[in-house]
Structures are given as structure tokens and as C-alpha cells.
A protein has these predicted regions:
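N-terminal periplasmic/intermembrane-space "pro-region" immediately following the signal or transit peptide
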Residues: 6, 19-108, 443
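A conserved mid-domain beta-alpha-beta active-site/ligand-binding segment of alpha/beta enzyme cores
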Residues: 234-236, 240, 259-291
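Positively charged n-region of N-terminal signal peptides that target proteins for export
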Residues: 1-5
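Outer-membrane beta-barrel pore domains
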Residues: 102-112, 155-161, 273-443
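Hydrophobic alpha-helical segments of integral membrane proteins
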Residues: 14-15, 19-20, 171
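Bacterial N-terminal signal peptides
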Residues: 6-15
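Outer membrane beta-barrel
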Residues: 85-101, 112-232, 239-265, 346-379
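Short, structured loop/turn "capping" segments at alpha-beta junctions
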Residues: 49, 255-258, 304-311
Length: 443
């Protein structure tokens, strides 16, 4: 900026004396010619106007030349380049502001109303190694819960909820038609939100391979790390617990998708001796009797006016659901043995529109049904029914994308108990209602 100032000042200083000298010489000459009677007053006035016009043009030429010189200097000046080692780095992030209302009635009808203003921040980066199929991903997130990145406003301006935690850290290898990821990562599986909370980041190894219309995905994930040296006779198990998953996804390329999935845990009642406990909506530190088979699906299509539509859903069951609710040592135990038919889940929904670009909007309506022994609250959508099982109800959503960086959505979730006689804590609530109003800024 200092160089620009000096050049422009110099241009005006250079132009000023030239124009001034021309003006003085012209006036003296015109006065002499007038006194000798060679020029009339009208002729002298015309000559002055012509000389002034020429002088202004010369001054403009000098200034234009100076400006052109400045532009050449600044265009040719090299910009500060990104270090070569960071040239393959992609940065992402978003901030969400939320109004959150919830009420989960007890079976006696007692209300538990709560409303909060909340925020969430995610800052991510992916580094693609040069001339390599490997990439490294890192994401920082607010809060520490496994199924929520939300922090609350209202701590008298404190900063206790605004700390950043490592949400993802993973190494990925991407081949021509196969993919391997190790670390703390987003789920690679095609799952409805009812079965998989969007804030969960799994920890372990994921593999996928594509063959024509099929994509096969498998995963082996650590859910509890234990120190085997602490095992005591008659004490709790100190064996590491794992979640195993496998899925075969098929699509016809025209909007139809079927994706059968199998899920199972290897452990039982964990004590988290090394990793500490985890917090989540209605979380249960119990991983026994979980062997789930499910069939997520969707069908997307367009009508004659180009409007996008989608039907989606899932059906499945926990093959060990009856054992789960009949085991007196299980937190899912319903109070008496011999219980049955509590092991199924399902959802069915419809969406119109696709809110991905500025000016687009969508709305959707969905029915959900999840019995007491059908699944685990450790993985399911933490917003619906406050993570409760033994619930059936609806989810209605509207989303509008206003700009490339801002969207607004409103979601209403309502449910009620399926079996009023079931009183175990994972599914002992009555009517549940949740209202979410989200404003998201992406950058």
C-alpha cells in the first residue's frame, strides 16, 4: 500500500508542474498578441479553452500511465504460496445453533419438560498424501458425549461446555473399487437414523469393496477396552468388547436400494476399567444379547415436473431380544420371565424434495417402531424419544437451504410406549415429545 501511495503522489507531482508551466506560457503569449492587436478577445478565449483541454488530456495520460505501472507491479508480485506439504489439505467445518425442547412423561403422567438453547462446532481436515492412495482425517467437536456434540448456553457466560474434543482421527486407503479405514471414523454403513445416531464415530477397522451393483462393507470396532491384568476370580470380566458389522448394499442405479445388515457384540456387562464410562442419551453399559439383522431400503424417483421424492425405511429384529428382556441380570429385564415378542423394530418414511443447494427445500414424515428388546439405546437416534426403547411414534421434518453456507430445519419427534407394563429403565417412559429448531452455518 505504501508503494502504491508513493507512485500515485509522484504521478500527480509530475503532472502538476507540466500543466502549470503550459498554462503560464500560454497566458503570457496571448496577452502579447492581444496588445499588438493580432488577436481579438473572442479568439483569445477560444485559444485558452483549447490549451486547457490539451493540458487536461496530458494530465490524464500521465495519471493513467502511473496507475498502469502500479497494476503491473502488483500483478507481478508473487502471492504468499501455501507450503507444498499443505497443498493437499482440505478444511471443513460447521456451526449449529439449536433450540431444543423435550418432554418425557413418566408412566404416571408426570411431565419432565425442558427447553435449552444449544450450539455445536465441528472443525475437520483431510490430508491427501501426494501421489498416494492414503489420506489422514481429523475432526474436532464440541462436547464429549458419544452421541451428541451439543453444548448448552446459560452457564453465566462460562466456557465449560465449549471445549473441543477429538471426534475423528483416522487413516484411509482408497483403491479403485475398495476402501479401508482405520481409527476413529464416521460410519461407512447405510443405516437409517433411527438405528444409528448421526453423532456417533466408530473406533476400529472398516473395509468395503464394490462389485457392479453391489457394495460389501464390514467393520470390527472396539467398544470397551479392558486391562486383562486386573482380572480377579469371581470378579467382572476384563475382556475387551467389540461390535461386529457386515452389510451388502445393492442398487439398480435408478433410485432403488436394498442394504441388509448384520450386527453383533462380543461382550457382556462392561466395567470400562481403562477407558472410563461413556455418556449418551439413555446409555446402558451392557453389550450382551445383541445380534441384530435388519433390512434398510429406499426408493427415490422424480415426477413429471422434476420434483424429487423418496420412500425409505427398515425392518429387523434382535435375534437375542427375548433373552435380553428375560435375563434377571440384564438392565433390560422386564420384571418377570417368559416375556416374548419384544424383539422387532421398523420404520417407514416419505420425503419430498432434496435440500442440498441454495434455494432448495424438503420435508419428510416418518413412522418409527422399536420394541424393548429389539435394539440398544447406545446406537439409536438420541433425539427421538430421548433414546428410549419400547416406543412407537412419528418424526416430521422441514429443511430449507437459504444460501451455500446457511440452512434452517425444524424437526418434531413424538412417541409413546408400546408395552405399558414394561418398566425396565431403557424403555419405561410414556409419551415423549421433542422439538428441534436448527440453524447451520457451513464454512
Amino acid at each position: 500500500m505504501r508503494t502504491l501511495t508513493f507512485i500515485l503522489i509522484g504521478a500527480f507531482l509530475l503532472a502538476a508542474p507540466i500543466v502549470q508551466a503550459q498554462d503560464n506560457s500560454t497566458d503570457i503569449l496571448i496577452q502579447v498578441l492581444l496588445r499588438k492587436g493580432i488577436l481579438s478577445e473572442s479568439e483569445a478565449s477560444e485559444i485558452r479553452q483549447e490549451v486547457t483541454a490539451v493540458a487536461e488530456a496530458q494530465k490524464a495520460e500521465i495519471v493513467d500511465a502511473a496507475v498502469a505501472q502500479v497494476e503491473r507491479v502488483y500483478v507481478s508480485s508473487p502471492s504468499v504460496p501455501m507450503p507444498s506439504k499443505l497443498s493437499n489439505l482440505t478444511l471443513t467445518g460447521n456451526a449449529r445453533f439449536r433450540y431444543h425442547y423435550e418432554n418425557a412423561e413418566s408412566r404416571s403422567g408426570e411431565n419432565n419438560d425442558r427447553s435449552r438453547w444449544r450450539y455445536r462446532i465441528r472443525l475437520g481436515s483431510i490430508y491427501q498424501f501426494k501421489e498416494s492412495a492414503y489420506s489422514l482425517g481429523v475432526q474436532l467437536e464440541t462436547a464429549t458425549s458419544n452421541d451428541s456434540n451439543n453444548a448448552n448456553f446459560g452457564g453465566f457466560f462460562d466456557k465449560s461446555g465449549g471445549g473441543m474434543s477429538v471426534g475423528r482421527i483416522y487413516l484411509n486407503y482408497k483403491g479403485e473399487d475398495w476402501n479401508i479405514t482405520f481409527g476413529k471414523q464416521a460410519s461407512p454403513f447405510y443405516m437409517p437414523k433411527m438405528l444409528w445416531d448421526g453423532d456417533l464415530n466408530i473406533e476400529g477397522l472398516s473395509e468395503s469393496i464394490s462389485r457392479g451393483a453391489w457394495t460389501f462393507t464390514a467393520g470390527q470396532y472396539i467398544i470397551d477396552e479392558e486391562n486383562e491384568s486386573k482380572e480377579r476370580i469371581g470378579g467382572q470380566s476384563v475382556t475387551d468388547d467389540a461390535l461386529l458389522m457386515a452389510q451388502a448394499k445393492w442398487t439398480n442405479g435408478e433410485g432403488l436400494v436394498f442394504a441388509p445388515v448384520l450386527m453383533a457384540t462380543t461382550g457382556g456387562n462392561s466395567n470400562f476399567s481403562e477407558s472410563g464410562t461413556f455418556s449418551g442419551a439413555n446409555s446402558v453399559q451392557y453389550f450382551h444379547d445383541f445380534a441384530v439383522a435388519g433390512l434398510p431400503f429406499e426408493y427415490g424417483f422424480k415426477t413429471g415436473n422434476g420434483q424429487k421424492h423418496k420412500l425409505f425405511g427398515a425392518w429387523g429384529m434382535n435375534l437375542k431380544g427375548d433373552e435380553l428382556v428375560n435375563d434377571p441380570d440384564s438392565p433390560f429385564f422386564g420384571g418377570s420371565t417368559g416375556q416374548s415378542s419384544k424383539n422387532q423394530f421398523a420404520n417407514l418414511g416419505y420425503q419430498m424434495g432434496s435440500a442440498k443447494k441454495a434455494g432448495e427445500h424438503q420435508w419428510s414424515a416418518e413412522y418409527r417402531f422399536m420394541e424393548a428388546g429389539a435394539y440398544t439405546p447406545n446406537l439409536s437416534d438420541s433425539d427421538w424419544a430421548k433414546g428410549q426403547l419400547n416406543q412407537g411414534g412419528y418424526v416430521i421434518n422441514y429443511k430449507q437451504v437459504f444460501t451455500d453456507f446457511f440452512n434452517l430445519s425444524v424437526t418434531y419427534l413424538v412417541g409413546d410406549s408400546i408395552d405399558d407394563d414394561y418398566m425396565a429403565s431403557p424403555g419405561n417412559k410414556g409419551n415423549t415429545q421433542v422439538l428441534l429448531i436448527d440453524g447451520v452455518v457451513s464454512f
